[in-house]
Structure formats: structure tokens, C-alpha cells
Design a protein with these regions (language model features):
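Short, surface-exposed polybasic-and-hydrophobic patches located at secondary-structure transitions
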Residues: 49-63, 116, 314-325
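Flexible glycine-/small-residue-rich
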Residues: 41-43, 51, 94, 105-107, ...
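Residue-level signature of catalytic and energy-coupling elements of molecular machines
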Residues: 39, 103, 262, 301
Length: 353
């Protein structure tokens, strides 16, 4: 160990080396593979991966209970935490690459288990979503002579929403790609506003990838929750407030911030369709010990984007505008993907036809 390293740095290096040994070749290879999304160890010792274009599969590799327990202990040590049978749940980030890790020990499982969700190595932009058929956005023949050729449909609607500072709620089920889509919207935000706006991101685990130059990333701790961070963000002179996954009482603070001079936000929520996403927000708002607040929700949320996971991949199936709330429920306008978002350049071209 080089003498110039402090004792703390030496400990960090040793923990990193120990972590790599205990992860083993199979896990390290999976983490290095850009096609792999998640790496999972079941209590029976089988190692599974979720791979783009393939789905879930057994790697054929096995990890013993003793090795898995040692691994989780080392991960906990890198996080300044201890995982024991009395504290059998570990959640945090793998400090090798920022991947999210959740580990379990008996008695909550029969034998040690974990799931590692890899940090996004690349950010998919909206053009990538269109190219892969996840997002509707085709070039109309009458507009093909414009350079660059504009797209119509949902892609154009999302770009317009980003430019005009609409609040966007990304809705989807487990593993539907909500965070990846939020990162795609953040990428579009970077290309649209550059350094002209200050963006604050708030999340429990660092998964959002924001490349806006004027950006502050906030993350919860055991003593600072999401609600506290949203309120703190308001004192940091934000132009836009982006919330990773809304899962609790922070929904109320977020909606109020979007509604009081900080439009252009993005957030994700777990639900199966646009209307269910708003109802889910109602449920989360009530965790702040207030009534459901449908009027506030309808005023704060401008656009809902629904992404689903299908047997063949991800697909954005629905985009809807929120026009208000009534006694019978929310007033939503599903957006037809054949609609063209007319930029001034497109408008001049169409007039000339």
C-alpha cells in the first residue's frame, strides 16, 4: 500500500479489493456487460441476470451462502453499515460503479440473497426511443426535406412539454423503465435549456443522470427523508425540481413546489395507467396526513407518460394531458400519436406546400 495514502484511504482500497474478490468473476462479468440490467442471487445459490433483448435467465453460476454473506458484509462496510440477523436488510449503492444493491440475510430469507440493479451506463435520448420503436415519432413525407427532419407524435409532444416547462409524471409498473425514461427526458432537457436553468434532482438512490451544467443532486439519508429534501430544494434557488420515484408523503411537497413557481418538473410513480398514476399520487399525499387533494394534483401535473414492459421489450403506450378534476374524477385527454407538434420551422414549410 503506498505510504502517501491516509489510513482511511488504505481501508477504502482494501475494502474495494475485498469486494471484488467476493463478488467473483460471474458477478463482475455481468456488471461489465452493457446488455445486463440486473444481477440477482436467490437463496438457493443460483445467479440470475436480466439481459436486454433476452430477459431473465439463469447464468449457471452458483454462489455459496457463506460467500454471499461475506459479500453483503463487505458491501455494508463500504456503506458504513452493518448487516446482521438482527438488521437483515441492506439497501444502498455498490461503490464500484454506483449500481443499486438490495441484500437480505436470514431470517427474512432462507439463505443470503441480493439484487443488483446496474447504474445506467448510457442515457437513451428520445431519438433512441423512437429508433427502437419504444416511442411513437415518425418523419412525415411532406416534412422530409426539412433539415433536421422533425418527428411527429409522442416524441414531439414530449419535446414540446420539456421546452414549455410542463410538469411530467412518468407512470409504469415494476421494471417498466420509468427511471430510464426520466433520464431520457433529462437528456432532452440538457439539449433544450443548456446552462440557462438550475436543476435539482432528489432521490433515495442515485439513478438519475442529469448533465445540465447548473445541477445539484440531493439524496436521502437515514435522518433526511424525501419530504425534507423537497422543502430544502426550494431554498436552493431551483428552476426545475426533479424527483426520482415518488413513494411517500413527499408527493405533497413536490406538487406544491411544482405549483408555486417551479414548473417543468419530472417525477416517476408506480402505477399501471395514466388515471391510476394520479390516484396513486392521491394515496401518497394522504401519507402527509391531509385529504387526497385531487384539485392540487390536477393543477400541478400537466402530462402523464405511461411506459410498460412487454414480452418483447418496453413501450410507451399512453400520453395524456390533465385538464382538471371533477366530482366524477380526473379529466384526461389521451394524445393521438399522429398529431404533429408544429415548430415555427415546420409551420413555414407547411404554408409553402
Amino acid at each position: 500500500m503506498p505510504e502517501q495514502l491516509s489510513l482511511r484511504d488504505q481501508l477504502h482500497v482494501r475494502l474495494q479489493e475485498k469486494l471484488r474478490r467476493e463478488l467473483g468473476a460471474a458477478v463482475l462479468d455481468a456488471l461489465a456487460d452493457p446488455r445486463v440490467i440486473e444481477v440477482m442471487l436467490n437463496p438457493d445459490g443460483r445467479l440470475w441476470i436480466d439481459e436486454l433483448g433476452v430477459g431473465m435467465r439463469d447464468t449457471g453460476s452458483r454462489i455459496s451462502a457463506a460467500q454471499a454473506e461475506n459479500l453483503l458484509g463487505t458491501v455494508a462496510a463500504t456503506l458504513g453499515y452493518v448487516i446482521t440477523p438482527e438488521r437483515p436488510v441492506l439497501e444502498g449503492e455498490l461503490n464500484l460503479d454506483g449500481s443499486r444493491v438490495c441484500g437480505l440475510l436470514p431470517p427474512v430469507v432462507l439463505a443470503p440473497a441480493f439484487c443488483i440493479r446496474k447504474a445506467a451506463a448510457l442515457v437513451y435520448g428520445l431519438d433512441d426511443y423512437v429508433r427502437d420503436g419504444i416511442l411513437d415519432g415518425v418523419v412525415l413525407p411532406t416534412l422530409a426535406s426539412i433539415d433536421p427532419a422533425p418527428t411527429c407524435g409522442h416524441a414531439a409532444i414530449l419535446r414540446h412539454a420539456i421546452r414549455t416547462r410542463q410538469n411530467i409524471l412518468v407512470v409504469g409498473g415494476t421494471q417498466s423503465g420509468k427511471t430510464t425514461l426520466a433520464n431520457g427526458l433529462l437528456h432532452e432537457l440538457t439539449t433544450s435549456v443548456g446552462s440557462t436553468q438550475r436543476v435539482l434532482t432528489i432521490e433515495e438512490t442515485r439513478e438519475l443522470r442529469c448533465t445540465v451544467p447548473n445541477h445539484v443532486a440531493l439524496r436521502t439519508t437515514e435522518t433526511v427523508d424525501m419530504t425534507r429534501l423537497v422543502r430544502t430544494a426550494l431554498r436552493l434557488r431551483p428552476d426545475r425540481i426533479i424527483v426520482g420515484e415518488v413513494r411517500g408523503a413527499e408527493a405533497l411537497a413536490m406538487l406544491k413546489s411544482w405549483n408555486t413557481g417551479h414548473p417543468g418538473g419530472i417525477a416517476t410513480v408506480h402505477a399501471n395507467d395514466a388515471r391510476a398514476g394520479l390516484i396513486r399520487l392521491e394515496q401518497l399525499v394522504q401519507e402527509a396526513n391531509v385529504p387526497p387533494q385531487p384539485a392540487l394534483i390536477a393543477e400541478a401535473v400537466d402530462l402523464i407518460v405511461v411506459i410498460v414492459r412487454t414480452p418483447t421489450g418496453r413501450k410507451i403506450t399512453e400520453i395524456a394531458r390533465v385538464h382538471g378534476a371533477s366530482a366524477s374524477g380526473y379529466v384526461l385527454e389521451p394524445i393521438d400519436p399522429t398529431i404533429v407538434e408544429q415548430t415555427p420551422q415546420m409551420h413555414r414549410h407547411l404554408i409553402a406546400l
